[in-house]
Amino acid sequence: MHIDIIGDIHGCYREFTALTEKLGYVWDKGIPIHPDGRKLGFVGDLTDRGPESLKMIDIVCALVDRKLAHYVPGNHCNKLYRFFLGRNVQVTHGLETTVAEYRALPPSEQEMIRRKFIRLYEGAPLYAVLDEGRLVIAHAGIRHDYIGRMDKKVKTFVLYGDITGETNPDGTPVRRDWAKRYRGDAWIVYGHTPVEKPRFVGRTVNIDTGCVFGGALTALRYPEMTTVSVPSSMPHVPEKFRTFS
């Protein structure tokens, strides 16, 4: 299996286009296709905060429909899904940018994008186990003893990370560094927590290099285990990046 897994995009369509071209994909009829048959992987959080979230929904839906990509949802995807279902969610923490794009559309187009995203989300696995179990794509990561499980505890971990229930002074949840304790055989490729450069710890790789916060958009090439990045066009917000001891 040959796949290029892309970190949290958050509506950064311009950088996504540049990254796929750098990876050797050719854009045809609005989607990137690799001449050697490589597929794309997405760790979730396609939308929110960035300028072109709805375009990313369109593209990823088209890729998944054509079996050219593997997509797993992130916490922002989960919140957008609940918004589209009419649930009472707070339109904050970036969701407001996607909702503004959505509300600017004519009603017929609103319904089209709503249905499209609901279908994408409901058709996606919580996490993807690929290459006969040698590779797992999970938005915020996954413990080795959680692989194969789908219960509420696992869903919380996969969408939000190993949260303690406490909060940092800036309001973000305190998270344990689960990657340091991972002892599984499968490679875990994840995002969710922005880091200045791809973080390899054991057989885990965090590829969320904070594109929407002015970092970069990064892909991990599997099975080569090399990374490819393009710089962000967004303003740099250093306090959004996590450092590890």
UniProtKB/Swiss-Prot annotation:
Top-rank taxon of the source lineage equals: Bacteria
Coiled coil, from the record? none
| Main enzyme class | hydrolase
Signal peptide, first to last residue: none
Instruction: Tell me which EC number(s) this protein carries.
Output: 3.6.1.17
A cellular component term from Gene Ontology for this protein is: cytoplasm
| Record field: catalytic activity | P(1),P(4)-bis(5'-guanosyl) tetraphosphate + H2O = GMP + GTP + 2 H(+)
Keyword GTP-binding appears in the UniProt entry: yes
Q: Which cofactors does this gene product need?
A: Ni(2+)
InterPro entries per the UniProt record, alphabetical = Ap4A_hydrolase, Bis(5'-nucleosyl)-tetraP_PrpE, Calcineurin-like_PHP_ApaH, Metallo-depent_PP-like, MPP_PrpE-like
Q: Which UniProt keywords apply?
A: GTP-binding, Hydrolase, Nickel, Nucleotide-binding
**A Pfam family annotated for this UniProt entry:** Metallophos
Name the Gene Ontology molecular function terms of this record: bis(5'-nucleosyl)-tetraphosphatase (asymmetrical) activity; GTP binding; nickel cation binding; phosphatase activity
UniProt function note: Asymmetrically hydrolyzes Ap4p to yield AMP and ATP.
Family indicated by similarity? Belongs to the PrpE family.
The protein's name is: Bis(5'-nucleosyl)-tetraphosphatase PrpE [asymmetrical]
> Organism, per UniProt?
Geobacillus thermodenitrificans (strain NG80-2)
